[in-house]
Amino acid sequence: MVYHWHYPTPEGFSDMEMTGDGEFLTGLWFTGARGAGKHSGPWTEAFLPVFAETSQWLDLYFRGQQPGFVPKFQIQNLTPFRQEVLEILQAIPHGETMTYGQIARQIEKKQGLPQMSAQAVGGAVGWNPVCILIPCHRVLGANGSLTGYGGGIENKIALLKLEGHDVSKFKLPK
């Protein structure tokens, strides 16, 4: 059974939706996000302990604090490539960013590959089912462009501002 809960965010952000299996968080996304269909129901509305834990984490995060814990989440349909990309995303510190190309270079080096596609990395980043917890919003295009965020460019900008970035240094999509 899949459970669902709606999380009202502070002003300046779209609200969020979360799903869980009864023990683990399995999805966290902005309401109306591109690709939200991958989280489609049917759901049972319930406020589970993992939703309470995730809500507490989000409350702290949206107040500009760095929570000292991570809610229990479980990612389904995880390929080895996606896992590698998501592990790199989890290692991007609060207040820092990386480009898709930098992530690709890390994978090249680790696997001893002659080349890794930044576009393939982008596909894996876009697949992330638990946004913010796995901080895909910290990934930029090669020229510092704010591209490829399924939660909406406005939310990406707001998240980066919340983390202390001067977003005027980034390039906005046209």
For each of these PLM feature ranges, what is it?
Residues 22-70:
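Compact structured core domains
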Residues 4-6, 17, 27:
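Beta-strand secondary-structure signal
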Residues 15-22:
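Broad, structure-driven detector of short, well-ordered beta-strand segments within folded domains
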Residues 2-13, 65-174:
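Nucleic acid-binding interface residues in structured DNA/RNA-binding domains
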